[in-house]
């Protein structure tokens, strides 16, 4: 079902602008039982939330705001694209999970749906071990292909290597099972399917949005891994394993913007990526063996085990594996740092715009169960909380597209519907508790965020206010209204404190400042402050931490100029896209991309982004310590080193505001006026006095 149709059916125009900032509502800060959860947030799918679901959300205090990431993008049919589609696999599966000690046998019948024209990927068995493109993995032989990077350099690529059995039929919603052995030589020359998900159609064929849509066929048969190796074949090369983002409801490893060829060939590293289940198919939780939750994270974990056991066959060093990901991908990386099941499967981590403490990263078990039952009800399945097996049995029979089309009605407002949960298996406790107790992998991390993290999502939610065009501004009245819509669960004192913190008091009526304040409000709450928190905790434990603030806006960026440097804008440069001369990047942007790739690959090789000897081309990147808190600004022609970033605003969200809410929970505070009086600054004097007084009460216990 198209998102446009859902918007028309579910939403009246007056509801569209209520969808954004509710996820910014402080509800998840104030009520710790739920942690909301990419290019990981704000996506078209948030528009599917109708007023009837908003009303139903009041039935449960655990139902919270739904902020959806638009991390889905373009269907690129270009024959030169790095990834092109294929499908394959047999019909019966033998479940033998040596890692978990599980033995059983089930069968997927031949009626399993396949896409027309795509066949099983087996080649003739005439390949010999002398063929450098034929690799013998622990499950069987695979044949790769040689590709040319845009720079003209060659790489060898193996795409669509099965690391798990297809999660079809009775395996839907379950943890993955290792792939079975095969005979002959398996063709690994075409990229894998993308896992079933909704597709962003909100802005039509606008490239700034469609670049995140899956570009290979959608299928439940999607658990495959890709390996790209520089030529000549290295020995014991560092491995960089990419985990894509998309709010846990979308995304695919095959996007053009993730093209592995340039990074691998320019930096002499092996680049690996994996597909994992998203949306309800990957994260539905009912607390039963049939629907244990976190299936998508277990997919990732199984892929990490495959890399550990096989990457040496491709010239990689299994003792130098670095995970890197963005948005929900960065959250995934961070959860592997926390999980006892994953900690020993890799060495280092790069987290781009994501942290496990983000309000959208996890939900409680109770909320996850409620959402699963709402989905069951939406697709006419049994939804009795005392008969969960009946719900799962029915949900397994439904078309996967029907599930993902209906899951956005399974929650109140402004949350990604199916995200990780503390399941007692992959995660034993909340990320906050793990960080506080020091129960996480002690290692080197590189992390950071972008200057305008919030705009991408606001454009999808406040569609009437922030239109996708130049010259958009926000009046003071519109700003105050947006803050109210953004924070529906907090009292008047807290809401006025937010207004005060994000007002430009030099020019409080400046329409550009008011617009930009909304971006900072969203970006600080959902991204920057959580990234800061994670980096700080790692630094306090004595780990090597390197932090960045990404500030470069591509000259060819299709979004309006006022959107600045948005969520995900660094990805092109990490993978070396500017080096593709056909895409029109300027020479200084090509050099900048080379610098970013070198920083990232240096870190993967040594745990330090700096070169072994000082270089004028690579400014020194200082460590982010618990006291210094330094970060490097990543932009054209800049070597600026700052502290933070945004320490004051993050102290506001993480320290001051929770205390203010606690101190004023029983007070009635007059809300700020919709239209400021003669002077915007004078209208808040009484409120400011109250806030300061309450802070003193909280701080000094007077």
Swiss-Prot record:
Protein's recorded name: Acetylcholinesterase
Organism: Culex pipiens (House mosquito)
Keyword check for Membrane: yes
Region (Disordered): 107-134
Glycosylation sites: 187, 637
Major location (coarse): other
Membrane topology: Peripheral membrane protein
Superkingdom of this protein's organism: Eukaryota
């Amino acid at each position: 079902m198209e998102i446009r149709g859902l918007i028309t059916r579910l939403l009246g125009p007056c509801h569209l602008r209520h969808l954004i900032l509710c996820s910014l509502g402080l509800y998840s800060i104030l009520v710790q039982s739920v942690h909301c959860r990419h290019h990981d947030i704000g996506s078209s799918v948030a528009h599917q939330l109708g007023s009837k679901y908003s009303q139903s959300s009041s039935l449960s205090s655990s139902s919270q705001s739904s902020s959806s990431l638009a991390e889905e993008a373009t269907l690129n049919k270009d024959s030169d694209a790095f990834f092109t589609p294929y499908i394959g696999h047999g019909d019966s599966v033998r479940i033998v999970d040596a890692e978990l000690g599980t033995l059983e046998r089930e069968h997927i019948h031949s009626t399993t749906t396949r896409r027309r024209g795509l066949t099983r990927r087996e080649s003739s068995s005439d390949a010999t071990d002398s063929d450098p493109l034929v690799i013998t993995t622990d499950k069987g032989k695979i044949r790769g292909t040689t590709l040319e990077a845009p720079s003209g350099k060659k790489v060898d690529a193996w795409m669509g290597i099965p690391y798990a059995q297809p999660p079809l039929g009775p395996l839907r919603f379950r943890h993955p099972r290792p792939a079975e052995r095969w005979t002959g030589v398996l063709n690994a020359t075409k990229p894998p399917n993308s896992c079933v998900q909704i597709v962003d159609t909100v802005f039509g064929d606008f490239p700034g949005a469609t670049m995140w849509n899956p570009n290979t066929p959608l299928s439940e048969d999607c658990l495959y891994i890709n390996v790209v190796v520089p030529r000549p074949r290295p020995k014991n090369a560092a491995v960089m394993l990419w985990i894509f983002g998309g709010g846990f409801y979308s995304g695919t490893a095959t996007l053009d913007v993730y093209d592995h060829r340039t990074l691998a060939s320019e930096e002499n590293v092996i680049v690996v990526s994996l597909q994992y289940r998203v949306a309800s198919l990957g994260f539905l939780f009912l607390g039963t063996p049939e629907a244990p939750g976190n299936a998508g994270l277990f997919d990732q974990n199984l892929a990490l085990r495959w890399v550990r056991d096989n990457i040496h066959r491709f010239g990689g060093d299994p003792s130098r594996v670095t995970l890197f990901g963005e948005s929900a991908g960065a959250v995934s990386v961070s959860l592997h740092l926390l999980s006892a099941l994953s900690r020993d499967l890799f060495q280092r981590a790069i987290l781009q715009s994501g942290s496990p403490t983000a309000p959208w990263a996890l939900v409680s078990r109770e909320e996850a169960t409620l959402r699963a039952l709402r989905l069951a009800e939406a697709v006419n399945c049994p939804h009795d909380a005392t008969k969960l097996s009946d719900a799962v049995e029915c949900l397994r029979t439904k078309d996967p597209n029907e599930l993902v089309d209906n899951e956005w009605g399974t929650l109140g407002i402004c949350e990604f519907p199916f995200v990780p949960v503390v399941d007692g298996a992959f995660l034993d406790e909340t990320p906050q508790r793990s960080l506080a107790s020091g129960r996480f992998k002690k290692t080197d991390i590189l992390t950071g965020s972008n200057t305008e993290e919030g705009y991408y999502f606001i454009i999808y939610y406040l569609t009437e206010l922030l239109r996708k065009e130049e010259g958009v501004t926000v009046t003071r009245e519109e700003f105050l209204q947006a803050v109210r819509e953004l924070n529906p669960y907090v009292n008047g004192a807290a809401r006025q404190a937010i207004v005060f913190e994000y007002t430009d008091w030099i020019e409080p009526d400046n329409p550009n400042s008011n617009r930009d304040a909304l971006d900072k409000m969203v970006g600080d709450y959902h991204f920057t402050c959580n990234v800061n928190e994670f980096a700080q905790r790692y630094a306090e434990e004595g780990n090597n931490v390197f932090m960045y603030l990404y500030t470069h806006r591509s000259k060819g960026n299709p979004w309006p100029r006022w959107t600045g440097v948005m969520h995900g804008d660094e990805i092109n440069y990490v993978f070396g896209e500017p080096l593709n001369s056909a895409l029109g990047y300027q020479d200084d942007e090509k050099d900048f991309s080379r610098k970013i790739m070198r920083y990232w690959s240096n870190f993967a090789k040594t745990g330090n982004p700096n070169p072994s000897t000082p270089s004028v081309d690579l400014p020194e990147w200082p460590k982010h310590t618990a006291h210094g808190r330094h970060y490097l600004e990543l932009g054209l022609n800049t070597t600026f080193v700052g502290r933070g970033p945004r320490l004051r605003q993050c102290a506001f969200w993480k320290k001051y505001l929770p205390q203010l809410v606690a101190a004023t929970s029983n007070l009635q505070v007059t809300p700020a006026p919709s239209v400021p009086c003669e002077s915007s600054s004078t209208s808040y004097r009484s409120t400011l006095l109250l806030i300061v007084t309450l802070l003193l009460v909280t701080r000094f216990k007077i």
